[in-house]
Amino acid sequence: MTKSLPGVADLRLGANHPRMWTRRVQGTVVNVGVKVLPWIPTPAKRILSAGRSVIIDGNTLDPTLQLMLSTSRIFGVDGLAVDDDIVASRAHMRAICEAMPGPQIHVDVTDLSIPGPAGEIPARHYRPSGGGATPLLVFYHGGGWTLGDLDTHDALCRLTCRDADIQVLSIDYRLAPEHPAPAAVEDAYAAFVWAHEHASDEFGALPGRVAVGGDSAGGNLSAVVCQLARDKARYEGGPTPVLQWLLYPRTDFTAQTRSMGLFGNGFLLTKRDIDWFHTQYLRDSDVDPADPRLSPLLAESLSGLAPALIAVAGFDPLRDEGESYAKALRAAGTAVDLRYLGSLTHGFLNLFQLGGGSAAGTNELISALRAHLSRV
């Protein structure tokens, strides 16, 4: 007779345990789990996931992600927002990223501050160890405009710098709810303009070869920066990015898509997370959800924008609006390279150290970024 582990049922959300103790157990599970996962053979991952593949909408979920998600749910971890608590949610995301296994990726790293519309903006610059002039990517981290920082995306920026052979400038823009919309947009645009002006003299990067990119909320900010830069260049003059690298971006705050219904629970980013992020970002803000500064898909014109390299994940509630943005850009005459990672979930780029599909997908997107920037 098969027995379940003693006490597992009691660890589910809703059990009568002190909240802090439950969070501590969840944190331990995350730390241990992510270190063990890369060493488990794929057939064993299937067995540990009850021997069943998850197939939705014609896509089969990556076995590594399937095991991670199923194990997390057993211990009450589902989604990024923790008990509607900003501090706990930020700590949760930071803990996941810090727990990732593997050696540190060695590139030259410098912390700095750059001028912004409301004061200095913390930033981190990454340079390939070989030196030499390269393109520069201005990177905006994900986290629902509410979570995340320079450290949560440090490993991804290091990997991008090394494997794309480019310089990366990661921007620690202001977060909600302390700084509601459009604070993040203002910081993101100011950072791009500053980076473009100082790419050569400050970093030794190739002048005029500055791209923008980011994951999730950072992809949203990248798309918005491209539109703002285009409009400024048309009417006032100013720099524009040479490429936009949009990684499972949020593009329409008003959307109620099919993928939102299919993947709104159980696939890392939940519908509840999305709603909570929107509440934080728009709290005390007078910006309408349909404003292009929030919803770049709803901009009056999508012509004249930088070429786009867009990634969508098959098990992501944001999948459909990412595809819709790619389609709309193409219809407006913008060059688009759309990469569909069917077996993956939202957030897989922060999980590349787990191996499996997350590593393969991340490598594909960084290789594509390198190829695109070599041609602009």
Swiss-Prot record:
Optimum pH is 8.0. Stable between pH 6.0-9.0 (with pNP-butyrate as substrate). Keywords: Cytoplasm, Hydrolase. It is found in: Cytoplasm. Optimum temperature is 45 degrees Celsius (with pNP-butyrate as substrate). GO terms for cellular component: cytoplasm; plasma membrane. Its main location: cytoplasm. It comes from the Bacteria. It catalyses: a carboxylic ester + H2O = an alcohol + a carboxylate + H(+); an acetyl ester + H2O = an aliphatic alcohol + acetate + H(+); a butanoate ester + H2O = an aliphatic alcohol + butanoate + H(+); an octanoate ester + H2O = an aliphatic alcohol + octanoate + H(+). Signal peptide: none annotated. Disulfide bonds: none annotated. Induction: Expressed in macrophages after 6 hours of infection. In vitro, expressed only in acidic stress conditions. Pfam families: Abhydrolase_3. The keyword Cytoplasm applies. It is an enzyme of class 3 (hydrolase). Belongs to the 'GDXG' lipolytic enzyme family. Non specific carboxylic ester hydrolase. Hydrolyzes various pNP-esters, with a preference for short carbon chain substrates. Can also hydrolyze tributyrin to di- and monobutyrin and 4-hydroxyphenylacetate to hydroquinone. This is Carboxylic ester hydrolase LipN.
